[in-house]
Structure formats: structure tokens, C-alpha cells
Curated annotation (Swiss-Prot):
Keyword annotations from UniProtKB, A to Z: Amino-acid biosynthesis, Aminotransferase, Histidine biosynthesis, Pyridoxal phosphate, Transferase
Protein name as catalogued: Histidinol-phosphate aminotransferase
EC numbers, comma separated: 2.6.1.9
Tree of life domain: Bacteria
Known cofactor(s): pyridoxal 5'-phosphate
Reaction catalysed by this enzyme: L-histidinol phosphate + 2-oxoglutarate = 3-(imidazol-4-yl)-2-oxopropyl phosphate + L-glutamate
Family under the similarity heading: Belongs to the class-II pyridoxal-phosphate-dependent aminotransferase family. Histidinol-phosphate aminotransferase subfamily.
Known pathway: Amino-acid biosynthesis; L-histidine biosynthesis; L-histidine from 5-phospho-alpha-D-ribose 1-diphosphate: step 7/9
UniProt lineage: Bacteria, Pseudomonadati, Pseudomonadota, Betaproteobacteria, Burkholderiales
Keyword match Transferase: yes
EC top class named in words: transferase
Swiss-Prot/TrEMBL GO biological process terms: L-histidine biosynthetic process
Native source species: Burkholderia multivorans (strain ATCC 17616 / 249)
């Protein structure tokens, strides 16, 4: 350093200490693997539909900013998804952005976020980013909702936000409707966010009832339906809530290509629904086959994935990697997930390769 020059500022001088202590969200390189780690729909669009979409996208004005609230798309979404008349719709760049908007808008000093654990990691991460306290309420040993513990935690902590994933990720659990209603009735001082990211595979929904409760919003994404690449989530709830969240939404958060793709494919939901039906059938076949393997315990799932407990999760994960099959080792995420791996339900060919690899990893 030259004499007389001031000491330069470093990131450590400026960045929050809790951020410095974090690590980036890990996303493994899946090149050359059968990719069964991220709950994606394995099916591409049929070729004629993909070609028609390509022609539509070629006409999009890339030189113009996107509409901040695309009225035609929102109306089409309301109609296609059966949004109650008393509710509005807010779009996000994936449900992750919606979670972030909710966290930022509700980040009063001392406010808390509460959710069952293990659950979707972004509930806690987004809370931490917004400097909200996160309270995790463990599921029961069978990975069902501990409703009494939830009610006690709500009474103790009076959280600003309560997340209920319906069904839950990574467990696949579809919480009992009566238990959810007990939580809704008890958490009168909280915003309840019902996360229905996997609704196409659960075939159960609280969205039709979103307008019945003053403090309930329902969140969905098109990712699991087969459109993970366009990053589009939406929130349904009373305008009084959504108008406030809209204030912290980046003004051009949904790009023109995403808007055009969603508008086009909402006219072809029958294709995506048929793919979801095929994946539900594959889920049943895969669950039965995996459960027959030595040492494997398959938990009931209402998502497009299976949570499986094996004798040694790390060894199974590595053995599958050797066979060029990528799954998710969730065994370190929470004590209730000890020795568990999460398997995305793929196409019949992908599932056959997964089963062949699992048979090598779990010999008799």
C-alpha cells in the first residue's frame, strides 16, 4: 500500500454480520444426470404447442418494459384458477419473490415468522433476510402436523406471518383440513400464507375459500405444473393485503417473455393438467416400487416427489450419483429427516433409471 493512501473499505466493513455468516443457496450442476432433485415437471411442451409459443414470443416487444400489472393476464388467471370474486391476484417472479415481498412488508421490529419444520427453506431464509425472527414448530415423528404445538406456539409468539405449505416440502405431507382450520381460527393476529406450490399433484386447495378469512392469502407457482423456467408465482387474497404487498414489489418484476408465455399457456391448461395426471400415476407406481426395496421407507406424498428414509442417506446419494442420477439428500436439513432422501417423480424412463440405481444402492 502506498504511504498516505486511506485504508480501503472491504465487504466485511459494510455487509451485515448475519449475511457474512451465510452461504449461498446451493444448486448442483446437473449436466449429464437424470435430474430428480428439484421437483420439476420432466415433460416438455408438445412440439406443435412449443412451435406456436415460439411464434408468439417472436412478436413480443423486447424493447419495452413489461406491464407492471398486466390486466389481461390477471383476468385470465383469475378465470382459469377460479379466484373468488372478493379476492385479487398479485404476481411474483416465482413464489420466492412473493415470500420476500411479504417478509419485507411485515418486517416490523420484533415481528416473527412461524412455520412447521422441516418445511420450505425460503420461509426461514426470507425472514432472516428481512431481519424477522423465525420460529419453527417441529412436525410429529410421522411428519404430520403437530397442531397442538402449532396452537401453543402461535399463542406464545403471536407471529406476524404463519406459513402452511399444502402439501409440505420436503415431506410431501398434506395437512388435515380440520387442523388447518383450527390454526386459522386461532391465529387471528397473524397473516396466514397457505402455500399451494404442489396443488396440481395434491388436488386439494384452499384457494376457493381464500375470501372467507380476513387474514388468509393463498400462494401458488406455475413451476411445478411444468413452467419452472419462466419463474411465475401468484398470490390470491383480499385486496387490503395485496395492495400493501404491491408497494414493495419491484415495478417491472414479471418480464415480457414470462407474461406472454403464461398468457399463451393459460389457454392450454388441458395439456399441463394431463402431464400432472401422468405424474400422479407415476408417483403411485414409483412409491410402490421403492417401498419394496430393502431398508426403504416411503412417506405418503401429495407432491411430485417422494421422501424416502434409507439406512444411509449419504451412501445412497453417492451411489445414485455414480449411476448419473441426481436426487436431494435432505438428511442434514432437520433431525426429523435423518437418513432421508427426496426423489422427484420423473418420466417413466427416468423413474426406471432411478429404480435401477436404487436397487444397486440398496442390495438385499
Amino acid at each position: 500500500m502506498h504511504a498516505g493512501l486511506p485504508t480501503m473499505t472491504t465487504p466485511q466493513d459494510i455487509i451485515r454480520r448475519d449475511v457474512l455468516a451465510m452461504t449461498s443457496y446451493p444448486v448442483p450442476d446437473a449436466s449429464g444426470f437424470v435430474k430428480l432433485d428439484a421437483m420439476e415437471n420432466p415433460y416438455p411442451l408438445p412440439e406443435p404447442l412449443a412451435a406456436a409459443l415460439g411464434e408468439r414470443l417472436a412478436r413480443v416487444a423486447l424493447n419495452r418494459y413489461p406491464a407492471p400489472r398486466p390486466a389481461a393476464l390477471l383476468d385470465k388467471l383469475r378465470h382459469a384458477m377460479g379466484v373468488p370474486g372478493t379476492c385479487d391476484v398479485l404476481l411474483g417472479n416465482g413464489s420466492d419473490e412473493i415470500i420476500s415481498m411479504i417478509s419485507v412488508a411485515c418486517a416490523k421490529p420484533g415481528a416473527k415468522v412461524l412455520a412447521p419444520v422441516p418445511g420450505f427453506v425460503m420461509y426461514e431464509l426470507s425472514a432472516r433476510f428481512a431481519q424477522l425472527d423465525f420460529v419453527g414448530v417441529p412436525l410429529k415423528a410421522d411428519l404430520t402436523l403437530d397442531v397442538d404445538a402449532m396452537l401453543a406456539a402461535i399463542a406464545e409468539h403471536r407471529p406476524a406471518i404463519v406459513y402452511l405449505a399444502y402439501p409440505n416440502n420436503p415431506t410431501g405431507t398434506l395437512y388435515d383440513d380440520a387442523d388447518i382450520e383450527r390454526i386459522l381460527r386461532a391465529a387471528t393476529h397473524s397473516l396466514i400464507v397457505i402455500d399451494e406450490a404442489y396443488q396440481p399433484f395434491a388436488q386439494h386447495s384452499w384457494l376457493p375459500r381464500a375470501g372467507e378469512f380476513d387474514n388468509v392469502v393463498v400462494m401458488r407457482t406455475v413451476s411445478k405444473l411444468g413452467l419452472a423456467g419462466i419463474r411465475l408465482g401468484y398470490l390470491v387474497g383480499r385486496p387490503a393485503w395485496l395492495n400493501e404487498f404491491d408497494k414493495v414489489r419491484p415495478p417491472y418484476n414479471i418480464n415480457v417473455l414470462t407474461q406472454a408465455t403464461a398468457d399463451f399457456l393459460l389457454d392450454h391448461l388441458d395439456v399441463l393438467d394431463a402431464q400432472a395426471a401422468e405424474l400422479r400415476a407415476e408417483r403411485a407406481r414409483l412409491a410402490q416400487a421403492v417401498a419394496a426395496l430393502p431398508g426403504a421407507t416411503v412417506f405418503p406424498s401429495a407432491g411430485n416427489f417422494l421422501l424416502v428414509r434409507v439406512p444411509d442417506a449419504a451412501a445412497v446419494f453417492d451411489a445414485l450419483l455414480t449411476e448419473r442420477v441426481l436426487v436431494k439428500n435432505v438428511s442434514k436439513m432437520h433431525p426429523l429427516l435423518a437418513e432421508c432422501v427426496r426423489l422427484t417423480v420423473g418420466s417413466p424412463d427416468e423413474n426406471a433409471r432411478l429404480l435401477a440405481a436404487l436397487k444397486l444402492a440398496l442390495p438385499d
